[in-house]
Each structure stands twice: as structure tokens, then as C-alpha cells.
Amino acid sequence: MIKSITVEEQVVDLKEPFITSLRHLHSYPIVQVVIELESGEIGIGQCVATPQIVGDTHQEILNDLNSELVQGLKEISAEDILELPILPSSRAALDMALWFIGSHAQRAVKTDVTIPISNLYDLRQIVRSRVDAGFQHFKLKVNQGSIGELLQRIDLIREVAGDNTPIRIDPNQAWSLEFAVDASRELEKSGAFIEYLEQPLSRSNLSGHKSLSQEIVIPLMADESCFSARELEGIVESQAFKYLNVKILKSGGIFPALSLIKEAQDAGLNISIGSMMEGEVGIRAAIYLAAETAPDAIHDLDAAWWFKKSEITYAEGMVYS
């Protein structure tokens, strides 16, 4: 039985700016929900608003979790949470709190590290800091600039990190189809190891992604195009993608994420677990999800490395919860 559900606000401070085509973060608020059971057990869940991605706001999440519907809950299961008429991020925080009550084993998986959008002058030091920290796979955030500058960035990463360093390119929906085709062809000529191109076009443009996949060799990853099993059907039918990035907040919790991953893997997609930078508890939950579903994959779980304060450990390209 649930004794109380407490909603708290916290601020996450980053040690350096996190810059993508969608977000520019130095610090940001997160919402933490604490479920206390009559037995004395406590579960903690976290979420963050991402208006540019999920379409929610911080205040909407607070309203959800402080609502009479949620505050009046006395018994709840992961299946029950799916039926709550609240935002996916709000559901995810509640789902995460239930997971927290029963799971504290340490897990470890391989992860990449993000290289944010920056000027070329700063890029060298940014890459060097990540190499010195032991990371071996790099996710390069980009917007639609010039192809020449994109190639310069790739060359610089290879120069600092090694010629055959695996690089993932993530435009976060910022590219046009024409630019994506032209840029990918030049990248293929460069000899760089481009592991995949993540969500280059807008999330609704599955036909464009299919056309792109037929024009280039570099595999595509779906991220913003797939939040749930309903959208997965379109992803699979498009035959455009080889990879799928799954995030707990997008899916609405660990329980629905597990279901989505099973369906995606059955359809032949390779899974990578990511996060919305929703706080340390959220990253621990994502590490658990990654270890349970794709233990040998290189995931996208560097978020806690950006935090000024964190007890999550990173070493030699691994993240330890």
C-alpha cells in the first residue's frame, strides 16, 4: 500500500554546456517523485521536460504528479501506470519509482560520449577531454551547416581520437533530405568509420528516411520518430532504419520500454538505450534497461558524466551504476 507520494523539484548543473540542434543547456530543472509504502520502502523516480522533443513542460509534469488522480493512489503496478491519463514523462517517473523499490544491483554497460555543437577552435579540446576520460565511441551533435565544416569536424575527431574511431552523427532532425544525401556521400568517401546517422530528418518524415537509406551506405538510427509501439510499426514498415534509440521518458517508463525493445528486436532492429538527461536516478534506471536488453551494445548513457555532481562512474568507455 502507498503511504505517500511526494513531488520535488531539483536543478541539475552541468560541468560544460550541452548543445544540440534542439537544446542548449548549462543547468536545468528536473522533477523527482518519491513513493513511500506503508512497509517503509521508498522508491524514487525522475523526469525532465523536453518541450522540443516530447512536447511537455516542467509545469505540466508538476501538475500531473500533484493531481488528485496521482496523489490519491493507494495501490499501483507498472500496468496500472500505463492507463493513467498523464504525460509520458510523468508516467515514467512513477514507473521508475516502482522499479527503484525492487532493484538496486549495480550494472555496467558500454557507452558513447556526446560531442556538442561547438566552434572548431573549442572542438579539439572537447574531443581531447573525452579521450582522456577513456571514451572510445563518439556521438557528434550537428546542425545543417556546410558539408565542408562537417568533414572538418570528422577529421579533427579522427586526428585526436584515432583514425578508426567509431563516430555516430546526430543532427536531431535538423537536416533536409538533399543535404543528408550529399553529406553522407562525402562522409562515405572520407574513409571515416561512421557507425550510423541518427534521426537526420524530421520525426514525421519516414518516407524521406526511406529514400535516404536507399541512396547511402551509412545506416540510420531512429530516435524522435519512435516513442511507442504504435510508432514502431511505421519504423519497421519503412525499412529505413537499422538502429533504434529507446529512452525511458519517451516510452513512458521502464515497463513499456521493455515491451517496445522486445518488439523492435523481434523486428530485427539493433537497440541503443539513451536518456533525456533526467537526473542520476533516471540514468541508473537506463543503465539497468540497457544491461537487461542489450548488454553487448554501445549505448548512449553519458549523461551523468556531464553532471557536476554524480556518483555514477565512467571508466574506459563503460558506465557503472
Question: How should each PLM-predicted stretch be described?
Answer:
Residues 8-10, 114, 223, 274, ...:
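Conserved beta-strand termini and adjacent loop/short-helix elements that scaffold enzyme active sites
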Residues 4, 137, 196, 243, ...:
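Residues at the N-termini of beta-strands
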Residues 145-284, 288-290, 307-318:
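Catalytic core of soluble alpha/beta enzymes
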Residues 139-141, 247-250, 300:
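A general lysine-centric signal
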Residues 294-299, 303-304:
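Short helix/strand-capping turn motifs
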Residues 1-167, 172-174, 178-181, 185-188, ...:
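N-terminal capping/lid subdomain adjacent to the active-site entrance of alpha/beta enzymes
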Residues 47, 199, 301-303:
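Active-site donor-binding loop signature of nucleotide-sugar glycosyltransferases
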Residues 30, 241, 268, 296-298:
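Active-site lining segments that contact anionic ligands and/or coordinate catalytic metals
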